[in-house]
């Protein structure tokens, strides 16, 4: 196993790809693995099931979102536009 103190979960790549890339991967994975707010019940219990599929552990709501985060910047813009038109 490689040294992981600097890059955490990206230590699995060993010395490959450079430190900057591995730090970036570790930051994305850390944000992905934390619990997120459910759009249905509002609880902080949403976990990623697979790429782009998210599920709330509390209410069981399953929805599509971004690959690494349940809401993407483009999704936020689209939601804001549809809310202003309604």
Curated annotation (Swiss-Prot):
Cofactor(s) essential for the protein: Zn(2+)
GO molecular function, one term: large ribosomal subunit rRNA binding
Binding site for Zn(2+): 38, 41, 56, 59
Superkingdom classification of source: Archaea
SUPFAM superfamilies given in the database record: Zn-binding ribosomal proteins
Similarity-based family: Belongs to the eukaryotic ribosomal protein eL43 family.
UniProt name for this protein: Large ribosomal subunit protein eL43
Organism taxonomic ancestry: Archaea, Methanobacteriati, Methanobacteriota, Thermococci, Thermococcales
């Amino acid at each position: 196993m490689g040294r992981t103190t600097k890059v955490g979960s990206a230590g699995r790549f060993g010395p490959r790809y450079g430190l900057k890339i591995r730090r970036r991967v570790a930051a994305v994975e850390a944000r992905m693995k934390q619990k997120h707010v459910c759009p249905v019940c509002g609880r902080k219990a949403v976990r990623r099931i697979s790429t782009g599929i998210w599920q709330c552990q509390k209410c069981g709501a399953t929805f599509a979102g971004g690959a690494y985060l349940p809401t993407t910047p483009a999704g936020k813009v689209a939601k804001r536009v549809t809310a202003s038109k309604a």
